[in-house]
Structure formats: C-alpha cells, structure tokens
C-alpha cells in the first residue's frame, strides 16, 4: 500500500496487509514491544537512507527501497505467524488486530484527505476486504480449534490471493499492465515496424530518437531498437552521472531520457535517426525524411556522428558541472575530460568557441493571457491567466545559417520560483505545439537558461507555467557559433570506419592521421566490465565525459575491439553453488532428524 499525496513523494506503509498485523501484534505484546519499536524505526531509517538499498543492488548511485521493504516484511510476517501459532494468546491477538484496524483506518482517511489524489475506490474496497479476511482469520485462528489446525495454510492461501489480486503499486490509478494489455495497448504504436524497416535499410550501429512518447521508458528494449530512454531501478552509475550532467531533470535516477532535448547531445550519443509520429514536422535544417513505416516518418539526423569519434583536445573536469546546458554541449564538441581523474596534459587544451550574440527583445509582438509592459527594465508580464505567454515572431533571419550552431539564452527576474517553457516554430509549422518545446525552472538564484536549439527557427514563445505575481524577461538572445570552430567537424570526420557490434563486442577500424595520441570516445556507458584491445594488445578503457568509454589511440591505423563481460561473474556463480550445497546439507540434516524421530 503506497500513500502518494504529492507527485514526487510517496510514503510506503506495506506491500502486504499482513505486515501491519505483524507490527501491531509485536507492539502490543509486552515481551516484544521494545524490540518492535526499535526494529520498526530501524526499518524506516534503512528505507529512507539509500545506503542499504544501494548495497543490496550493488550499484553506486542507484537504489531501490522495495528490496529492503520486502525482505523485512517477509521476516516480520514469518515471525508473527510463528508466534501466533505457538502461543495462541487471544488477548494479544485481539489487541493487535484492533491496533492494526486503527492504523489502516487512519491511513485510508489520510489518503482520501488529499484533493489532488484520485483514489481508485475499487482497489480501496479490495484492500478493505482482504483486511477483514485477515482479521477474521487471525482472531478466529486463536479461538476456533478447527480453524487453528489449518491456520498457517489458510493465511498463506490468503496472502497468495492478496498479492495476485492487488496487483497495483498504489491506491491511485497507476496499475500494472496485464499480458493482454501489453498485446493490445502497450508497445503497439508502430515503433516496432518502423525499427524493423530501418534495420533492413541500415544495419549499422546507431541510436534512434523519438518525437513522441510511448507507454514506458523501456520502449527501446520492447520494440527492438537502440533508444535514448530507460527506466531501471539499477541504472549503472555512469549512466546516472552522465544524465545528471547533460540530460533534462527527471523524477529520479531510475528515469533516463534524452529524447528531443538536444540534437547535438544525441549525436554525441550515436543517434542517427529520428522517428516522428503522424504529422510531425521535424526541423528541416537538422533532419531529412528518408522513409515511412508503421505510421511513423523516419528522419535522418544531418548532424549524426560515427559511432565512435576522435578527440585531439582535452578539458580539465573541474568546474564543468557548473556550466550552462549550452556550454556543456560546446565542451563535449571541442574536447574530452577524464571523469574521475586529473587532466593528463598529453593533449592540447580545449576551449570554447567565439560567440556572436543577437538580442531578440525587439522582436516581441504580443502577450497572450496576461498584461505586458515593455521598457528599459525588460518585458514584464502580470495578471497571469491560464496560459500566459509572450510571442517573438520574425526571427528566421537570426537562425538561417546552416554552417552555424545556435543557442538560446533567457534571463528572467521573477517574483518567486517558477516553471518556464520556450516553444519554437520552424518552416511548415502552423502554430506552436508540444512537439517543439523546452521546459525548465527559473529561480531567483538561477535565473538564466541556455540551451542548444536547431537552425531554421521562425518564431519563439516564452511561457510562464506557474501562477506568480510577475515575470520580467531581462534578456532574450541568440548565441551563434561557427560550426567548424566548435569542434564538430573534427568529430564528424574522425577516421572511424567498419563499425560493428554483436555479442557485447564493438569492433572498428580507427585511423589516427596525426603524430600524437587521440582519444576515441565510444558512446557506450562506462562500467568495470569493459575491456579493450588495439591490434590484439590489451589497453586501458577510461571513463571520460562523465560516463562514456574512452580508448587512447596511437598514431596510425588500428583494429580496435571493445568487449563487455559481466564483472565477478565467476565469483557469483561459485558463491551460488556453495550456497545451494550448504542449503542441501542443512535441509538433508533436518530431514534425517525428523525421520529418526518418526521411527
């Protein structure tokens, strides 16, 4: 049972109703009261503090409190049933049942007290029904002799039925899909057909971006393509770190999604194609349509990089995390850095390219659903309605050069922290839409947003998404950079050919035409299990650019092999075998003792 009063805050009461009875019973019983209070507080502490759950999933920067909850629940429920079955203390059971009833009633009242929660009344009724069954069974088991004889089996049967019937993670409308739903409703939007069609046309190694949302973040796994999003409770630390450094803000480390955020960033991750839903008008300066399948239009990324590219310059990692999103993208084009190590000094120093700034403040035309005042202090909007925004048309000349890389910079003065959005139009768009929008937060401390945007923009719209007293646009400008000066052309022309990937093995022909070493960045996320060979000789795999694999390439043409193997696999298999053997020996000994007693 999960109480969820706010979208990002969940209070977990229990996975099974039986746990509430167990805790209530041990709290009421004098002999176990102190231990129950201590262990319950300890369980809550372990759930809140991520250390234990991170240890349980063996992944740094990832945690899953459910593992800890389920383990403690199973232990508490088992001890509870054992104690009730052995002692048959009617008074303690009755008092514990009363306390459990009070706790559950208070929990339900708490859930229903929040107006922003739409409680699933059907599931709430089923929860109450199972609670009553447990209550009658536990109280009756200590008072009725015939019921007492089948008490453990009866409780186990009800527990199994509860876990099957209440296949929902919460009392609100967030259900787990069934097999039939997966077949008819989920992962059935044409993406699989488009991916199969594209694979028949181009079987090289690449990632695919999407302009639309499918049912789940693990869409790529289910529909057969290498995507830019995932939802896993055990995301590797390198992926979590990379997304925290470069990706948009998400609910938790379990969610990773780069779709539609930054086409240059996606190119650096090996993205070569974009799937667009019906009617989607991709920015023509960035994407070229190459086919249709499954009701989707397939676009080729004009800025795609080879799946593996060479850096000849290096950054110092210190301070890079404080840069704006725009500058972070520019640093990734112009050079690499070691994620957890100091600058080597073996490469030429990288630097940001020169920029040209063009103000858009004079392009403002109108304000919608708010009042606007335009003076020397900026553009101030007040009296915000349901969808307040300011429109900047006629900006196509500022984004017309395909040989430049463009970014937007917006500086605000706000009465309080707010959510913002910048919509953009490109040629062929009939209006602003959710297909082309950047969302972000503006605070009094962090009042500037900067981001890479595509060429070919014709109009812009700035939205204030939160009801506040006022918002002032202090500065709104285009930042442009010569594409060659950014370092993009160097990466694009990297001598990385004959790329292939199968059975966790990446192979490529890499030509370093300089007299110095270069750093090959392969856009796989770094983990301890990666190993590399150059012309058959083993070399080090480095963690670069906050989580990608890096291999130092000497001068000349080389055959590079990058292979992944699960670390400590042999040790894990050995420990499993030893554990099974110990279990068999202990179990056999107990069987032998019981057999002797029967004889």
Tell what function each PLM region has.
Residues 150-363, 415-420, 451-453, 461-469, ...:
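Soluble catalytic regions of membrane-associated enzymes that act on cell-envelope
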Residues 407, 452-470, 555-561:
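Noncatalytic modules at the cell exterior or secretory-pathway interfaces
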Residues 404, 426-429, 482-599:
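Active-site-proximal, structured, solvent-exposed surfaces of multi-pass membrane proteins
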Residues 359-376:
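Extracellular glycan-recognition surfaces and repeat-rich motifs
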